[in-house]
Amino acid sequence: MKRHLLSAGDLSRDDAELVLRTAAELRELADRPIKKLPALRGRTVVNLFFEDSTRTRISFEAAAKRLSADVINFAAKGSSLSKGESLKDTALTLEAMGADAVVVRHGASGAPHRLAHSGWVRSSVVNAGDGTHEHPTQALLDAFTMWRHLGQGKEQSLDGRRIAIVGDVLHSRVARSNALLLKTLGAEVTLVAPPTLLPVGIDTWPVETSYDLDAVLPKADAVMMLRVQRERMSGGFFPTAREYSRRYGLDGRRMATLQDHTIVMHPGPMVRGMEITADVADSDRSVIVEQVTNGVAVRMAVLYLLLGGSEPAVSTSSTNEAEE
């Protein structure tokens, strides 16, 4: 893998499949009494979050700790950032602390790229979400979840699998990263949204688009629902929440039209009753909770591979060492 993970588009198929295979090894730790490995002992991982986050920050923290890394959580609120300190000065502070990896979430698209290529830090940089641009580790954990449920053949290939991503594509960094990564892995992606929630330039994405959810659902192998990000909206993108749910929400009636093997996904946080009803979110088809579990394994794999992992991630000797 490259030194940084900034975009899902930076990953070759070999890179992506290496992450998925490594995550599969590390996923087994979730079922063990002792969940730690010594792989990153002595390394320091900094979680630098300029935006609020629950799942992603906790997931990266758990991932680093399970690899025995030292973890520093650095939130904008309550730090010098809230007093006007620049990204550069914050980066220089992290460099002085000896950070080996910086996991950054920022409201400005391109901030992780700036941090990685500015020369301010020598550490690996992982994009944990930048504005409406990208969220590559979310795409990796989504692909890993699909890989476990829908993978075909010895290599568990996603070639030809049809994935529907439904909702607020315009403001979704998850949709963009998934579109790029799933194309790399051979899947066919259809974005379903009202015209007002599709970005300018969508015709350049490696996807198909549709305004008709009912026409897309029966053909899909996986359906990913997206939250309407009202905090990023300044105008009216649809008439009412009720009208949006009627046309683009996944409810029990629509779930009944899915193929028997089709899974239902959501990157979170969910708004139950808006884009997805409670009965669908809690159904046997839903893998939403599993996505969270898989997220830790995938982020462990990313940190392990970026920080120099070349041997198998899990071995008997390393497990025994962690238990001592």
Swiss-Prot record:
Keyword terms, alphabetized: Pyrimidine biosynthesis, Transferase
Single annotated GO MF: amino acid binding
Residues that bind carbamoyl phosphate: 55-56, 105, 135, 138, 268-269
Reactions that this protein is recorded to catalyse: carbamoyl phosphate + L-aspartate = N-carbamoyl-L-aspartate + phosphate + H(+)
Keyword set includes Zinc: no
Presence of keyword Cytoplasm: no
Biological process per Gene Ontology, one example term: amino acid metabolic process
A GO term from the CC aspect: cytosol
Enzyme Commission code: 2.1.3.2
Biological or metabolic pathway of the protein: Pyrimidine metabolism; UMP biosynthesis via de novo pathway; (S)-dihydroorotate from bicarbonate: step 2/3
Residues engaged in binding L-aspartate: 83, 173, 227
Family per similarity comment: Belongs to the aspartate/ornithine carbamoyltransferase superfamily. ATCase family.
Function: Catalyzes the condensation of carbamoyl phosphate and aspartate to form carbamoyl aspartate and inorganic phosphate, the committed step in the de novo pyrimidine nucleotide biosynthesis pathway.
Subunit comment: Heterododecamer (2C3:3R2) of six catalytic PyrB chains organized as two trimers (C3), and six regulatory PyrI chains organized as three dimers (R2).
Protein name as catalogued: Aspartate carbamoyltransferase catalytic subunit
Protein source organism: Nocardioides sp. (strain ATCC BAA-499 / JS614)
Gene name of the record: pyrB
